Amino acid sequence: MLWHAMPPELNTARLMAGAGPAPMLAAAAGWQTLSAALDAQAVELTARLNSLGEAWTGGGSDKALAAATPMVVWLQTASTQAKTRAMQATAQAAAYTQAMATTPSLPEIAANHITQAVLTATNFFGINTIPIALTEMDYFIRMWNQAALAMEVYQAETAVNTLFEKLEPMASILDPGASQSTTNPIFGMPSPGSSTPVGQLPPAATQTLGQLGEMSGPMQQLTQPLQQVTSLFSQVGGTGGGNPADEEAAQMGLLGTSPLSNHPLAGGSGPSAGAGLLRAESLPGAGGSLTRTPLMSQLIEKPVAPSVMPAAAAGSSATGGAAPVGAGAMGQGAQSGGSTRPGLVAPAPLAQEREEDDEDDWDEEDDW
């Protein structure tokens, strides 16, 4: 900028219009604080790395220390640059103060103008010619050049103090290949049994693997209910018996019960004997004993005699037309119908014998 083309009062006014040296001094203090903090971090990191090297030895330790050592160098470099900028800010404040002291002040310039005006007004018969020339010389030569020179020096020092060295960012401590592979967690690891990392596959293969990985999620969601049903059937099969081909191995509850079963819970009518011949405890499930059918007894225990005798044996002493056992409302002790002889009833000893057989049968089942 052509400072010599401007009057001294304009140059001085431009210089005085700034914020002064206070911002530069504050910036210098901030850079000094940052430099001290970086130095402390560098010292602490160096101590930590030394302790790590003593506690951890081997190839991995050497690689870790070699990767972390540049961090210490970067901290030290940044601290040095912070100190340099603090010095530059301090020098800028000093340059401003020097420029303000060198340039003519506005009151001095104003006094020159006032003196010039008075001498010109009182210049009768040329008596003030020499004082007027000296006043003009002081303004145009000394003040003008002094103000311009002060601004030129201040501009040059400002250019030097604002020229900062570029601070390079800290380099990554990871290898370039490792940092690139970690960006994709799916393809960053090689598959088991493969000698080539997945990250080095062609782009087409990588894209295909990505599509397969995206499709595996919905397929797992679709097959999850089927897996639950399969596990349920496996549990039922394990409980029902070890050999699925053997239909008579065991039965779980009433599953697999024969349609010809006489068990009441399976849809049967219960024992063929009437209610008058057996006690309530002798019916399956009516007493405190464990409910069991003859089929279950044959499958689990040794074969036993059936608890109910054939109906033909009970009716051997009765003539044709006699009512079967248990047909009447009162059991075997009831009177016969119109087609039988008057007063003909079922033999009482037979009913007592059937009751004792049933009780013995259920007692054996209770022991089980």
From Swiss-Prot:
Main subcellular localisation: secreted
Classification via SUPFAM superfamilies: PE/PPE dimer-like
Application notes: PPE68 is recognized by antigen-specific T-cell lines from HLA-heterogeneous subjects. Peptide P9 is an immunodominant and HLA-DR promiscuous peptide of PPE68 (amino acids 121-145), and may be exploited as a peptide-based vaccine candidate against tuberculosis and other mycobacterial diseases.
Family membership noted in the UniProt record: Belongs to the mycobacterial PPE family.
Job description of the protein: Plays a major role in RD1-associated pathogenesis, and may contribute to the establishment and maintenance of M.tuberculosis infection. Together with PE35, stimulates the secretion of IL-10 and MCP-1 from human macrophages, via the interaction with human Toll-like receptor 2 (TLR2). Stimulates high levels of gamma interferon secretion in peripheral blood mononuclear cells isolated from tuberculosis patients, as well as from healthy tuberculin purified protein derivative-positive donors. Does not interfere with the secretion and immunogenicity of EsxA (ESAT-6) and EsxB (CFP-10).
Subunit structure: Homodimer. Interacts with PE35. PE35/PPE68 complex interacts with human TLR2. Interacts in vitro with EspG1, EccA1 and EsxB.
Name of the molecule in the record: PPE family immunomodulator PPE68
Lineage: Bacteria, Bacillati, Actinomycetota, Actinomycetes, Mycobacteriales
